[in-house]
């Protein structure tokens, strides 16, 4: 699992955006995630993520969330993706 996110969010609008993305990722949903870097990941959501509190290396507190996606072609491989890296969620069905 990823330990510390690269970005922490404190503004209500940013936290609301994370929560909106989370609603698109229910347990066992089959999805294709389009990431902000242009890459895509296809697989199954293992469990709906939740917004969590983190501290950065300087002790500043903020929020972020990560989702675990079990790879569609290699289910034994899991991807842990920070929610702020997701540009779009495409729903493919459910497991």
Regions found by a protein language model. Give the residues of each.
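Conserved RNA-binding domains used in RNP assembly and mRNA/RNA metabolism
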Residues: 1-95
């Amino acid at each position: 699992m990823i330990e510390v996110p690269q970005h922490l969010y404190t503004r209500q609008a940013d936290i609301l955006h994370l929560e909106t993305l989370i609603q698109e990722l229910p347990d066992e949903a089959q999805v294709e995630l389009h990431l902000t870097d242009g890459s895509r990941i296809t697989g199954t959501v293992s469990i709906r993520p939740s917004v969590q509190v983190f501290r950065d290396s300087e002790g500043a507190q903020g929020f972020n969330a990560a989702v675990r996606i079990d790879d569609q072609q290699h289910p034994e491989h899991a991807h842990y993706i920070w929610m702020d890296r997701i540009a779009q969620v495409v729903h493919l069905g459910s497991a």
